[in-house]
Structures are given as structure tokens and as C-alpha cells.
Design a protein with these regions (language model features):
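Bacterial Sec-dependent N-terminal signal peptides
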Residues: 1-21
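Long, structured stretches of catalytic cores involved in phosphate-ester chemistry, encompassing
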Residues: 56, 220-238, 258, 267, ...
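Short carbohydrate-recognition loop motifs
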Residues: 49-68
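Secretory/extracellular carbohydrate-interaction modules
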Residues: 62-147
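Flexible glycan-contacting loops in extracellular carbohydrate-active proteins
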Residues: 192-226
């Protein structure tokens, strides 16, 4: 027996030595790694919480099926050649006597897709899942076609050996246009062969793509786990992938506002035995210079940097540096560019995205994740959204806004793991980080979390309280507050918002949850960042007769429009209202335009089937043909929307319009542009809602009656409407889901996409567009009826009762003008005008004070006791500085 073993090992050694390309070889270093969650710079673990390094081994912690660790720095190429791999395997959990558990190597995963997409191959079989070559718990080798449910190229169940340690040796070599797979399983101490097998005639297209380790607990026992060490990959078919080169550094986000740079680097969950120091370096005179040092913050695994008095006039290259020690000390770098503040540009371009899913439906009518059964990896994994990101970069944005749901706790790509929520969040957050890394490392970014980011379906934060103990699911959500601990919520906010300018009022809320509402100034566009979930009241306890379930009133006899309008419900809360009041009148730092960003629209722009009590039917609704109209819908009354509370909504919109500010949001999945109405239609500002980037909840807008005051070319669902809560809104454009033949069809037919907002410094015009997910700006167009072009002044479109004199200014360019009602002292509105003339309009009779000046120079003139007239032509006011 030993002689046969020696001959077999020699034969395999000869095969593995043929035509080696040394620089492509891989050898794991887990034997040199400190204990911890992170599996190392070369690999991606599915899932993050399912693996760790312990006692010099890579150990699987999960007893779920088909846990994988993909090798990201090497791939199996499509060229003809040899592939060799070997690994030492140990049983880490209970020994399985059913033969259902197995461990081994997955080859050819995601052969026709990007290696990052392929790295999500785990748990389920399906198209693109590769070939699983492994050793079952009874000592039988197999070669399984993991693209099919239960098909094996080779599997002879002849052994019944309760092994605890084995060495798996794999050799794949070409033969007459196909490939032959040879596998040995050896006792690592005695070199006795446990089993051997060969499969020939494997199609060459199956031996390309990713390679990964597999710990498979099986579907029967579910108690067996495996550990690995000494993994090697080599051969002429292996190619090095240099794009996965940041190691522990995942991404960075930054803002540069009012000469303050704030940058947050996101790290993998590095071990406590690794370094705690992260360094930010800047390129000065063609040399890298240390600019700041930060410590790894846990459990967010972030490093936060701040530099005051930043030179905003130049582009500056930077890199984040982090050292780890394995065989030797190696420094990893994450590179990016701090763009200069675009005060010199006539157009400030903003991108807005929200609600990203890393997968789409596996098939029509099925909305499960990767862990929901058969999964077509080659068509249903949208991560890392390569075409989308490449097209986004073509816009050359000055600022990018991510409006929330960067993470979906369920089915993106897997169901929520509430036993390990911190690592489950990071696992899904890292997918977002990697997707947008090319943007976020080199463009200022505003990122804010929404309900799904903090593991809620809907969220009424109620001032940051905890949900009542003992409640779960929608019952907990309806009660108000946060289901997850404050530490978890703060971790999420740290990963997503710690690079934002300092909060306007930093005091924590409720259970110690931090806040992030603030102002960010980019090129003179002042952006108010607000939180429209954290302070919002929960409706269920306020309306006991409504029978509210997950934010939807189930009592059909309860009149939502009239009964839901009360004065003791909050939307933004008093602290944010105070901030917005102060922000609306602050035009310093040459601010010439204002915008508000938040999670969701301040209206309920959606319809549902007439007989439905809530939106549970939305994922099941048939996607209509393009141009067709869905009949039989009613207006939605979703308390999760910011159509409620109406008083809080109106209060906020009155402040927005005082600053002539546009509103930019996400959340609803339904791309739209509306103009708000408060007392009358179209008397407040415009809003644009981005389509979902990845949509599993395709809301639509098919009201049961036509809108009024429509343009001739507008369809019936455009124009003036009151939503289900009685809020006035005018629909200018909406992107309903519709049938389409552009691949991936199951993604694009849901009208997924993104928004662009272009602010014009010279004209003060604003161009709003919603684009399809697949759109290339160099050859494609936005969705129909976009772009919508407005002027800054259109955001305060009340009908005036009178006019103040025209103001003509000399000695000052583009001054700021404030109109103050003397009886109340309230600033009616303020703005930085373009040029030197402006005629104010007012909306009530009485005396007004006009202030004209430049806040950056603290030069002001005031004219009091100015009374409006009903005619425009009157003696102008000449102001000289």
C-alpha cells in the first residue's frame, strides 16, 4: 500500500511540475496569520461571519451548505494549460457519519462573469456555479457538476472511513480539446491514500473562472465543519489578478467642505494581532508625505481622518497605508484623489443613487437570494455593477449622493443573520464599498443610511428610542424606535457617514444613537443633509382605530386623508428644523445654490391594487408593456412615506422654499420628478427621486384618475394630484416598470437606474434627469420626459400678492438679498442673486425689511418699512457699496 502511495505521489508531482509559471503561484499563509475574522488579503469569504483564522488554520464556523472562500488574486484563465491545487483539510465540527458533509475545492466558478461577481458563488447550485471537487465525510472523492442539482462527473461511494485529517491533491490537465480531472485524498501523516478518482472529457469552458475552498455541512447532518491550511494553486492555466490589490483596505469616502477634509477608510475586520495604525499620505512635490494617522475603530473597522485648512484649489493625490505581517511585513495601499473644490466650474454635476441590490430575481416571480435554492449566478448576480459604474464615471461628477439602502439585510445577497448582525452587515456593506470604490475614492460623497441599512423594513425612529422588548418583525417596527442595539446603529452610521462634515447639533438621541444632519458645500452649492427617519413619529399608537400593520392602515372604514392629519406627530424633529432655519438664510462661502438631501420623498407617489390593504402585492404584480396603463389601482397610504405626517412635511417644505432649495431623495424605487404643493399646487420646490439601483420591490404610479393642468404631451398620470394623505404634488416625470428587452431583462424591466442633477452657476438653472441602469451618457438618453429643466426661482413659486421695488446694486457682484417680514421678524426668503438687479415678490401685505450684502465680507445695508404694491413697475431702490 505504501509503495502505491509513493508512486501515486511521484506521478502527481511530475504532473504538477510541468510548465510552472512561478509568478502566478499561490500559497496560503494562514499558518502565519493572527487569529481573527478576516481570512487574508488574497481571499473573499462567504460569508464573512462563516469563517475565521484560528490556531494557524482557516476554519469554517457555519454548518450551512457550501460555504466558500474564493481566491481573488488568481483566476483560472481560458488558455489551454495545467491547473494544480492541494490543501490540508481537518474536521472541525462533529464528525458526520451520513456521508452528506464534504470539503474540497471549487473550480470554474463564474466562468463567464467578472471575478468579483463569481466570488458570490456559494450555498446554491446553478448556472455558473462551477465544479465541486471534494472528499465526503465517509472518505469518498467526488467530482460534482455544481451547475446541476445532483449530478456528478464521478462519485463512487465505496468507502466508509471516518477520517479527521486529509490532504486533497488536484491536477487538471488538457486532453484532446477537453480536460481530465485527477484527484487524490491522502492521510497527511502516513501518506496512505484515502481515495482517488479521475474524470475525463470535461468541457474546456468549465475549467475557467474562480477557484475556491468549500466547507459543506451537507443537507442532512448540518453539524460538520472543516478547517484548511497549506492551500496552494499553480500551473500554466493560472493567471494573476492585480486589480484585487488593496488587501485589508476596502474603500474610502471623503468630503471637502468649507476647507475641511474628512476622509474615512474602510478596512476588513483585521485581527487585534494586526497593526492598529492607519496612515494617510499625500503626494507633495512627487513624494508621499504622512499627513495624518488614525486608529482602527471597532466594530466598524474604519479609520477616520480630518485635516483643517485644506488647500481647496488643487487636486491632491492621496493614499491610505496599512501594514500587516505574515511571512514578512507588507504595506497595502488604497489610492485616490481629493478633487479641488469646483468653485471655478460653471456647472456642478451631482449623481444620486439609492437602493442597491447585488443580485436580481433568479427567475420571473421568485425573489429569493443566493441562499434560496437554485441560483443562476451567470445572469442574476449584478454585483459589482461594472457597466453602471463605468457609465457613472463618464458624467465626471463633482459630488455623488447615496440616499440609503446601501445594504439590504435580506436577499442581497443572502437573508439577514441576526445571530451575527455586525459581521452580516459588514459582509453586505463591503459589496457596496467594492462596487463604488472607483467613485468614492476620488469624488466627494454624501452617504446616508436608510431603514434597510439598520435592518428594518420600515423605520419610525421616534427620536432614537429602542423598540419595546419582546416585539419582533413588523410589530416591533410599528411600535417605533430601533430594533437593533444602539451600538449596531452607530456602527452602521460610522461606516456610512463619519466622513461627512461635522453634525450641526451633535448631541446623541434616544439610546445613545449618534446624529449626522449637517451641511456640505461643494463649489458654492450648499447641501443640507437631513435624517427623515430618526426623529419621525410612529403612527400605530397615534391611530389605534386605523389598525396599522407595517405602516399601512388595514381598517378600510378609517379615512386616512382626514384622520391622519394631526399636530402632535414629528417628521424631522425640532433640532433639524432649527438647523434648516439657520441653514436656509446662510449664503456665506459664496453659496449660490441650495439643495436638501434625505432618504425619501415628501409625498406618497405610489398606487397599489384597489383591493389590497398594503403593498405586499407589489413584488407579485405583473410588469406591464411599455406605454400601457395599469387599471384598477388606488392611491397608496403608506405611513413609511414622508407624505405623513402632513404638518411636519409642510413645515419642512416651507423652509426648503425659503432657500429656493431642491429636494433630492431615494427610497421609493420609483424614479420621479415632482413639484411640491403646500397650500396650492406648485407653490413649493421641486424634488427628484432616484430609481432603485437594484429593485426587488417595483412600485408604480397608475392613479385611478387623470392629473389636472397637464401639458399637451403629458400622459394621464402626470399633472396635479393629491396623494393618499391629501398632499399636493405635480408629477412632471415618472419611470414606471415596463417590459424591456435589454439584458439583464429582470433587472432593467424594473426601471432601475440613477439620477443626475446639474446646477448652472451662470443661469441658476437646474437640470434633473433619471437615467436607466444601462444608460451610457455618450449614446443613450434618460427615461422619457426627462430632463426636467427648472430655474432656481421656480422652487418658490407662490402667487405673490405684491412686489417690492427693484433692487439695483453697485459696487458688489452677486449680492445676497434677504426679505424679512417686520411684524414677525421672519426671513420670508433669501438668495444670492445673479448680477446686480432683483425685484422681490411677497405673499402678504405689510411692511418688509430688505437686507442686501455680502456675508463673506460682513458688508450689509438695510432698507426698512418697505411696502409692497400690486404692480411691478415702481421706483427702484439703488444700493451702493
Amino acid at each position: 500500500m505504501k509503495r502505491l502511495t509513493v508512486i501515486a505521489v511521484i506521478a502527481f508531482s511530475l504532473l504538477t511540475s510541468c510548465k510552472k509559471i512561478e509568478f502566478t503561484n499561490f500559497k496560503s499563509d494562514w499558518d502565519k496569520s493572527p487569529d481573527g475574522t478576516w481570512v487574508g488579503p488574497d481571499c473573499w469569504a462567504n460569508r464573512l461571519q462563516d469563517w475565521h483564522i484560528a490556531d494557524r488554520h482557516l476554519e469554517c464556523l457555519s454548518t450551512k451548505p457550501m460555504r466558500t472562500v474564493h481566491l481573488m488574486t488568481r483566476q483560472i484563465s481560458d488558455r489551454r494549460g495545467i491547473l494544480n491545487s492541494s490543501v490540508y483539510i481537518s474536521v472541525a465540527g462533529e464528525n458526520d457519519d451520513s456521508g452528506d458533509a464534504a470539503a474540497g475545492i471549487l473550480v470554474g466558478a463564474g466562468k463567464d462573469i467578472d471575478y468579483r461577481s463569481a466570488s458570490l458563488v456559494f450555498h446554491s447550485w446553478g448556472k455558473g456555479a462551477g465544479i465541486f471537487i471534494g472528499l465526503d465525510s465517509k472518505g469518498n472523492l467526488f467530482i460534482r457538476d455544481f451547475e446541476r442539482e445532483d449530478y456528478f462527473f464521478k462519485y463512487e461511494k465505496k468507502n466508509n472511513i471516518q477520517w479527521t485529517d486529509a490532504r486533497l491533491v488536484l491536477n487538471i490537465l488538457p486532453k484532446k480539446g477537453t480536460y481530465t480531472i485527477k484527484v487524490l485524498a491522502l492521510d497527511p501523516v502516513t501518506n496512505v491514500i484515502i481515495d482517488r478518482t479521475v474524470a475525463s472529457g470535461i468541457p474546456s469552458t468549465r475549467i475557467q473562472g474562480n477557484i475556491a475552498l468549500v466547507s459543506h455541512a451537507g443537507y442532512k447532518s448540518r453539524n460538520t465543519r472543516f478547517a484548511f491550511t497549506g492551500w496552494s494553486v499553480s500551473g500554466s492555466k493560472v493567471e494573476r489578478n492585480t486589480s484585487w490589490n488593496t488587501g485589508p483596505l476596502v474603500t474610502a469616502q471623503y468630503t471637502l467642505s468649507r476647507n475641511i477634509l474628512k476622509l474615512t477608510a474602510q478596512l476588513m475586520p483585521v485581527a487585534t494581532g494586526d497593526s492598529n495604525d492607519v496612515i494617510l499620505q499625500l503626494k507633495e512635490n512627487n513624494k508621499w508625505v504622512d499627513a495624518d494617522t488614525s486608529q482602527v475603530s471597532r466594530p466598524s473597522y474604519t479609520a477616520q481622518f480630518r485635516i483643517n485648512n485644506w488647500d481647496r484649489d488643487i487636486n491632491t493625490d492621496y493614499r491610505v497605508c496599512y501594514k500587516i505581517s505574515r511571512h514578512s511585513v507588507k504595506t497595502y495601499y488604497l489610492n485616490g484623489t481629493i478633487k479641488h473644490d469646483p468653485v471655478d466650474k460653471d456647472q456642478i454635476k451631482m449623481l444620486s443613487l439609492s437602493c442597491i441590490k447585488q443580485i436580481t430575481r433568479p427567475e420571473e416571480g421568485r425573489w429569493s437570494g443566493i441562499d434560496g435554492g437554485e441560483f443562476p449566478f451567470e445572469t442574476a448576480v449584478t454585483y459589482p455593477h461594472i457597466t453602471l459604474v463605468n457609465n457613472l464615471k463618464k458624467f465626471n461628477p463633482d459630488i455623488v449622493f447615496f440616499a440609503g439602502d446601501q445594504v439590504y439585510e435580506g436577499s442581497s445577497p443572502t437573508a439577514a443573520d441576526l445571530d451575527h448582525p455586525y459581521l452580516d452587515y459588514l459582509y453586505k456593506w463591503y459589496l457596496w464599498c467594492i462596487t463604488y470604490r472607483d467613485l468614492t475614492t476620488s469624488v466627494p460623497v454624501i452617504t446616508i443610511p436608510d431603514d434597510h441599512d439598520v435592518y428594518h423594513g420600515n423605520l419610525w425612529g421616534a427620536g432614537g428610542i429602542a423598540t419595546p422588548p419582546g416585539l419582533k418583525g413588523t410589530e416591533a417596527q410599528d411600535a417605533g424606535g430601533y430594533k437593533m442595539p444602539a451600538e449596531f446603529v452607530n456602527m452602521v452610521q460610522t461606516t456610512q457617514t463619519s466622513h461627512l462634515p461635522d453634525p450641526a447639533d451633535p448631541a446623541p438621541v434616544g439610546e445613545g444613537i449618534t446624529v449626522y444632519f449637517t451641511e456640505c458645500n461643494i463649489g458654492g452649492v450648499s447641501i443640507a443633509v437631513i435624517e427623515d427617519r430618526k426623529f419621525k413619529s410612529a403612527p400605530k399608537s397615534l391611530f389605534p382605530r386605523a389598525d396599522i400593520v407595517n405602516g399601512w392602515p388595514h381598517n378600510r372604514n378609517w379615512n386616512v386623508r382626514y384622520n391622519s392629519r394631526i399636530g402632535n406627530a414629528y417628521l424631522l424633529g425640532n433640532r433639524q428644523i432649527k438647523f434648516l432655519e439657520e441653514w436656509s438664510g446662510d449664503w456665506s462661502r459664496q453659496t449660490w445654490m441650495k439643495a436638501v438631501v434625505s432618504q425619501t420623498l415628501f409625498a406618497n407617489l405610489a398606487t397599489i391594487p384597489r383591493d389590497s390593504l398594503d403593498d405586499d402585492a407589489v413584488p407579485l404584480m405583473e410588469i406591464p408593456d411599455s406605454g400601457s396603463y395599469v387599471e384598477g389601482d388606488r392611491l397608496a397610504t403608506d405611513f413609511d412615506s414622508d407624505g405623513w405626517p402632513q404638518n411636519g412635511r409642510d413645515r419642512a417644505l416651507r423652509i426648503f422654499r425659503k432657500a429656493f432649495a431642491i429636494h433630492i431623495a431615494g427610497d421609493q424605487h420609483l424614479g420621479s420628478t415632482v413639484q411640491y404643493g403646500i397650500d396650492q399646487f406648485r407653490d413649493a420646490g421641486f424634488a427628484i427621486v432616484s430609481p432603485a439601483t437594484g429593485n426587488l420591490w417595483p412600485r408604480h404610479w397608475f392613479p385611478p384618475y387623470n392629473g389636472t393642468n397637464r401639458k399637451p404631451e403629458w400622459p394621464g398620470n402626470y399633472g396635479d394630484f393629491e396623494d393618499g394623505f391629501g398632499n399636493k404634488m405635480t408629477v412632471f416625470a415618472v419611470a414606471n416598470p415596463h417590459k424591456i428587452n435589454i439584458k439583464p431583462v429582470l433587472q432593467n424591466e424594473l426601471s432601475t437606474g440613477f439620477s443626475t442633477i446639474i446646477f448652472n452657476r451662470q443661469t441658476r438653472d437646474i437640470e434633473l434627469s433619471n437615467w436607466p441602469y444601462y444608460a451610457d451618457p455618450e449614446k443613450d438618453k434618460p427615461f422619457p420626459f426627462w430632463p426636467v429643466r427648472i430655474n432656481q426661482l421656480d422652487n418658490y413659486n407662490r402667487t405673490p400678492v405684491g412686489w417690492l421695488p427693484e433692487i439695483r446694486v453697485e459696487g458688489m457682484v452677486n449680492p445676497v438679498i434677504k426679505i424679512i417680514r417686520e411684524t414677525t421678524g421672519e426671513i420670508i426668503y433669501s438668495l444670492r442673486i445673479k448680477g446686480n438687479t432683483f425685484q422681490p415678490r411677497v405673499f402678504e401685505t405689510g411692511y418688509y425689511t430688505i437686507e442686501i450684502g455680502e456675508p463673506d465680507q460682513n458688508k450689509w445695508q438695510k432698507i426698512e418699512k418697505v411696502y409692497p404694491t400690486t404692480f411691478i413697475e415702481r421706483q427702484p431702490l439703488d444700493i451702493s457699496f
